[in-house]
């Protein structure tokens, strides 16, 4: 029995050793090479029928066995012929039957796999595409043979890096592969490690992902990862075939479809791909690498929105941050993290916000005193707002802004005693300088990278005021709460007037003023107090910056029945002097005010300006008045009005809380600046011509004639 088994193995080895291609063994072609080398009659290679038939058959039918024999012939020729190798190649190539075979031969018999090698491969494909006399089925078969030959001849390259097809070849496949053959075609691409790279490769992938369930599972590789016997195909080919964006397309679709069983493996592959290829390839322009990073973070945000796997989300973010090169500039990551923090803040997931922020303690990119650090601090304070705990927010500010000026500032504002003491007031300078941490102080672990060696800015202070007002609103009686808001306002004005260096007044903005006016208007319900706060503040001549699209002027004017027309005009005149931006809320307020006072011409002028800004009019009262006065109404506004009437919901736009924006995002937008420019003429015409100086008799006469304001 043992002897029989041994004999069978010997027969098998002999069968393999004496394998034939076109009836010719490799020993025969080796003998031809040796003979030609001795005689130097290289031209005979062109005419030798055995050599030509052997090579042509292997090129035309690139099975693994045929290609293995062909590559053995290549190595034999390189060893035997040395410097005459290229000469011999030329004669063999000339004898091959057609240009396709000649290009294939030249491509796969080059000594080195390099750009020239790929150029010949591309020429082979190009020739097949434009070769006349081939029907589609034959042309497709020739494409497949060429690709398969290339893979089998160069396994050390194609297994690790895949095969890049010119996009016009993918285009041919995309157009001419029959629908019932698409999955078979895609399986061929997978088998041969063809990269999903280029426009038409992407379209091919998209069509498969949106096709039948089986097509979707093949293109997404779920068909392989879920089958233990085929799992190796995912492990070996998924990361090779897919550059970052096609890979991300699959991950995004899995998330959308909630195919979450293997999502961690897909996210791991996507993360590894970005870390090791796109982010580290310096040949990719900086802006493109930055865009890849932003797209990756968008995928993670999509994952967080669609699932409850927050721990996996945080783990992936942490892994990506660890992998970033240490010299990565802050702007590279800023936009992505701002968007993610915005999302979690918007849904009220403060715990995740803090976990993301805690990563910066280990992250070397964010150096103190940078704009990024300041923004991150603002976001932390914004997240702390939900706890409505002044001690927590104030403690964080004192630790993050580690300067004696911080304590002095809070003391001058009356907040130190209010929060950590027994009531509103101030300590003397020595007491605040020598003060130890009060008992109510909360020790927090603030990363060193998120600390400043200076006093807090208006962003941080505004967050503290918001928390103070939210806390005491529920603790105090209405009269006591009103007294607190007024005291905070007076102490704040005193601080700006007496404790802010003249050279630093340019840093003053209106965010804190808006917060206090908002409390007067909507908490205390005192429009008159809101007006007085505004006018008294500007009487100090501090010229504050407008760092928000919502100025305090619109907040005071909107639905304010506590001021007369003259006071209304004074606010408009103040806006003119301050060159304050004007948004649609203010304009609507002005239009309705003029209608109420009977100044229809002026109301129509301002209404026209409102429409010219491009604002989508969705204010029921404004539309109703425009219809009553037979003014032109945009079609979308008409539809909105009719919809409201059908629902019997006479809606008005709610502006009450829109003035309190996230202070960390306090900035102009280009759209609002352009809108303000468009209506900038109001200062020179409507106000400049109609605001009546007290001692100007001519203007008084004009006022009487036109009854412009009706005071």
UniProtKB/Swiss-Prot annotation:
Transit peptide: 1-28
Gene Ontology CC terms: mitochondrial inner membrane
GO molecular function: translation regulator activity
Main location as per UniProt: mitochondrion
Keywords: Membrane, Mitochondrion, Mitochondrion inner membrane, Transit peptide, Translation regulation
Subcellular location: Mitochondrion inner membrane
Keyword Cell membrane: no
Disulfide links within the chain: none
Membrane topology: Peripheral membrane protein
Primary role: Translation factor specific for subunit 6 of the mitochondrial ATPase. Required for assembly of the CF(0) component of the ATPase.
Family to which the UniProt record says this protein belongs: Belongs to the ATP22 family.
Name assigned to this protein: Mitochondrial translation factor ATP22
Organism encoding this protein: Kluyveromyces lactis (strain ATCC 8585 / CBS 2359 / DSM 70799 / NBRC 1267 / NRRL Y-1140 / WM37) (Yeast)
Name of the coding gene: ATP22
């Amino acid at each position: 029995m043992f002897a029989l088994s041994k004999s069978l193995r010997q027969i098998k080895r002999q069968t393999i050793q004496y394998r034939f291609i076109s009836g010719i063994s490799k020993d025969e072609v080796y003998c031809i090479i040796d003979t030609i080398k001795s005689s130097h009659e290289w031209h005979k290679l062109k005419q030798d029928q055995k050599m030509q038939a052997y090579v042509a058959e292997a090129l035309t039918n690139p099975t693994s066995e045929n290609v293995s024999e062909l590559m053995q012939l290549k190595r034999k020729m390189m060893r035997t012929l040395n410097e005459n190798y290229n000469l011999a190649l030329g004669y063999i190539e000339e004898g091959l039957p057609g240009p396709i075979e000649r290009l294939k031969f030249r491509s796969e018999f080059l000594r080195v796999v390099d750009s020239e090698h790929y150029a010949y491969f591309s020429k082979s494909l190009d020739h097949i595409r434009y070769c006349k006399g081939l029907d589609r089925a034959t042309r497709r078969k020739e494409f497949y043979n060429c690709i398969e030959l290339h893979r089998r001849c160069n396994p050390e390259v194609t297994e690790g890096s895949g095969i890049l097809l010119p996009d016009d070849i993918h285009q041919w496949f995309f157009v001419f592969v029959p629908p019932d053959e698409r999955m078979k075609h895609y399986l061929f691409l997978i088998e041969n490690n063809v990269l999903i790279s280029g426009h038409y490769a992407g379209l091919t992938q998209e069509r498969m992902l949106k096709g039948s369930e089986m097509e979707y599972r093949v293109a997404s590789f779920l068909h392989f990862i879920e089958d233990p016997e085929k799992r190796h195909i995912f492990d070996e080919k998924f990361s090779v075939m897919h550059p970052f964006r096609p890979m991300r397309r699959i991950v995004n679709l899995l998330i959308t479809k909630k195919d979450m069983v293997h999502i961690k493996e897909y996210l791991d592959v996507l993360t590894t791909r970005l870390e090791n290829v796109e982010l580290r390839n310096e040949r990719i322009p900086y802006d493109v690498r930055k865009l890849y990073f932003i797209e990756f973070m968008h995928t993670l945000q999509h994952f967080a929105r669609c699932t409850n796997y927050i721990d996996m989300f945080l783990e992936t973010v942490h892994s990506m941050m660890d992998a970033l090169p240490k010299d990565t500039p802050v702007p590279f990551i800023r936009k992505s993290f701002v968007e993610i923090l915005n999302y979690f803040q918007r849904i009220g997931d403060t715990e995740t916000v803090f976990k993301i922020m805690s990563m910066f303690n280990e992250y070397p990119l964010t150096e103190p005193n940078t704009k990024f650090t300041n923004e991150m601090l603002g976001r932390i304070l914004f997240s702390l707002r939900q706890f409505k705990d002044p001690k927590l927010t104030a403690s964080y500010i004192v630790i993050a802004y580690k300067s004696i000026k911080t304590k002095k500032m809070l003391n001058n504002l009356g907040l130190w005693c209010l929060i950590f003491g027994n009531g509103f007031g101030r300590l003397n300078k020595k007491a605040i300088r020598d003060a130890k941490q009060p008992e109510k102080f909360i020790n927090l672990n603030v990363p060193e990278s998120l600390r400043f060696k200076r006093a807090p800015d208006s962003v941080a202070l505004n967050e503290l005021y918001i928390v103070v007002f939210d806390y005491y609103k529920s603790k105090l009686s209405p009269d006591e709460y009103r007294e607190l808001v007024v005291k905070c306002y007076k102490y704040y004005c005193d601080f700006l007037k007496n404790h802010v260096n003249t050279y630093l007044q340019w840093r003053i903005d209106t965010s804190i003023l808006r917060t206090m006016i908002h409390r007067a208007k909507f908490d205390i319900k005192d429009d008159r107090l809101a007006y007085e706060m505004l006018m008294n503040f500007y009487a100090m001549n501090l010229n504050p910056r407008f760092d928000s699209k919502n100025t305090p002027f619109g907040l005071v004017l909107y639905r304010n029945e506590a001021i007369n027309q003259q006071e209304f005009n004074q606010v408009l005149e103040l806006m003119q002097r301050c060159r304050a931006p004007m948004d649609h809320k203010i304009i609507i307020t002005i239009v309705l005010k003029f209608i109420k006072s009977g100044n229809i011409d002026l109301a129509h002028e301002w209404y026209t300006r409102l429409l010219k800004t491009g604002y989508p009019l969705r204010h029921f009262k404004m539309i109703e008045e425009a219809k009553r006065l037979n003014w032109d109404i945009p079609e979308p506004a008409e539809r909105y009005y009719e919809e409201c009437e059908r629902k019997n919901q006479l809606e008005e736009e709610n502006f009450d809380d829109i003035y309190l924006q996230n202070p960390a995002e306090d900035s102009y937008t280009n759209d609002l600046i352009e809108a303000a420019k468009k209506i900038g003429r109001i200062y020179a015409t409507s106000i400049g011509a109609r605001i009546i100086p007290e001692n100007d008799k001519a203007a008084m006469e004009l006022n009487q004639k036109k009854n412009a304001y009706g005071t």
